[in-house]
């Protein structure tokens, strides 16, 4: 059986990890083992935070809708409840955008709710 040398494969694998960890602090961007550990942790964080971002944005939208609807003496839960009663289907992202960017349309929406 012939001998297989794998120096190239190992170097390529290590180089790939070090390229991913460019910009990390300390030895995490220079040495392979700490870089590999930081890479694995960074990937775990990114996986977790992709899910967390959805929750954060939803709560941000709700906060924006609540603050905009309180200008009309109506809190968020009452506003959403009345929208559902009137069978108006606008998601929270759109409502938040309307409250910030196009407040005239949001004003009309509030008037239809009353």
From Swiss-Prot:
One of its GO terms (molecular function) is structural constituent of ribosome. GO terms for biological process: ribosomal large subunit assembly; translation. Belongs to the bacterial ribosomal protein bL20 family. Binds directly to 23S ribosomal RNA and is necessary for the in vitro assembly process of the 50S ribosomal subunit. It is not involved in the protein synthesizing functions of that subunit. Its main location: plastid. CDD domains: Ribosomal_L20. This is Large ribosomal subunit protein bL20c. It is found in: Plastid, Chloroplast. One of its GO terms (cellular component) is ribosome. HAMAP family: Ribosomal_bL20 (MF_00382). It comes from Tupiella akineta. It comes from the Eukaryota. NCBIfam families: rplT_bact (TIGR01032). Keywords: Chloroplast, Plastid, Ribonucleoprotein, Ribosomal protein, RNA-binding, rRNA-binding. Signal peptide: none annotated.
């Amino acid at each position: 059986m012939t001998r297989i040398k794998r120096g190239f494969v190992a170097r390529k694998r290590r180089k790939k990890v070090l390229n991913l960890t460019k910009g990390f602090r300390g030895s995490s961007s220079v040495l392979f083992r700490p870089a590999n550990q930081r890479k694995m942790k960074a990937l775990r964080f990114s996986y977790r935070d992709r899910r967390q971002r959805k929750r954060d944005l939803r709560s941000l939208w709700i906060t924006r809708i609540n603050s905009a609807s309180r200008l009309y003496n109506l809190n968020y839960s009452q506003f959403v409840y009345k929208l559902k009663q009137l069978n108006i289907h606008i998601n929270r992202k759109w409502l938040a955008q309307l409250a910030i960017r196009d407040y005239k349309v949001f004003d009309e929406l509030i008037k239809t709710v009353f």
